[in-house]
From Swiss-Prot:
Purpose of the protein: The cyanoalanine synthesis reaction is more efficient than the cysteine synthase activity. Probably involved in detoxification of toxic cyanide produced in plant tissues.
Gene name of the record: PCAS-1
Transit peptide location: 1-10
Protein name per UniProt: Bifunctional L-3-cyanoalanine synthase/cysteine synthase 1, mitochondrial
Subcellular location: Mitochondrion
Pfam families xrefs: PALP (PF00291)
Any single Gene Ontology cellular-component annotation: cytoplasm
Protein family membership: Belongs to the cysteine synthase/cystathionine beta-synthase family.
Amino acid sequence: MASLLRRRFYSSESSFAQRLRDLPKYLPGTNIKTQVSQLIGKTPLVYLNKVSEGCGAYIAVKQEMMQPTSSIKDRPAFAMINDAEKKGLITPGKTTLIEPTSGNMGISMAFMAAMKGYKMILTMPSYTSLERRVTMRAFGADLVTTDPTKGMGGTIKKAYDLLESTPNAYMLQQFSNPANTQAHFETTGPEIWEDTQGNVDIFVMGIGSGGTVSGVGQYLKSKNPNVKIYGIEPTESNVLNGGNPGPHEITGNGVGFKPDILDMDVMEEVLMVSSEESVNMARELALKEGLMVGISSGANTVAALRLANRPENKGKLIVTIHPSFGERYLSSVLYEDIRKEAQNMQPVSVD
């Protein structure tokens, strides 16, 4: 009897295991994504209302906070890693990815590395926010912070030093990788064109690696050569306007040099926006529009408002981007006063 029960038990167990193996990996006919990278893209455009009162033009802003890691950098990170894999340059589980970053690109790369199975080493200036560092570490990336006085140049140099000393290492090189620009030519640009039904007149965007303004600009120009494209750089680090690199608070913009992938010919002009203007506008967007965004989003909005107030742009549709979510900036200058206020709050008595 005992022998018979054992046979039945193991037979039942074997049958159950076999049924599990026979299950399809995904349920057919469902609208369920098979992996989180499929959530990248298709972010919405929304009109500005209160901050744009009195302007002669319409301003619509693409909300990249809706990406998996709350920033636009998910697009090029996904594109560059996939491109390198297709070319046989990197292999999950074998290659160590090394990349210099000011924050958001590093987070997106750490996210992709975790999903695909790469070891990730990121170099970044030590002035970047605590939230960025914690988020990168949460995705398993190793961080190396560099001297803030050396800017992104110092961060890039350290990344190359690590590249030489690390076995099986590879750098995707966001500042010179054509896949960065191509990501925006193939996704961001077409999304803007489709959502505006081809009615976009002006696109304005801050310049970091240059991938977004170049890719979107090239796509929109291919659809309508009359679309005007404008770039933005920090007033304090206006190298594209012939000035000198310098410290500023617009994280992700104004890297202090002209990136290789930046298409200067696609732009009408590179506007200059100060850190103070950018910070103040980012705060105003939260209070007046309910849009909690980062400092570069503030810069993009300031520039869009300037263009909207030019007489020749009356009645036109201006599109810009809010590249990242404001919660990533809680420890930065953006919310310094509120942070101190919150830290000093005292509990009230409850009867």
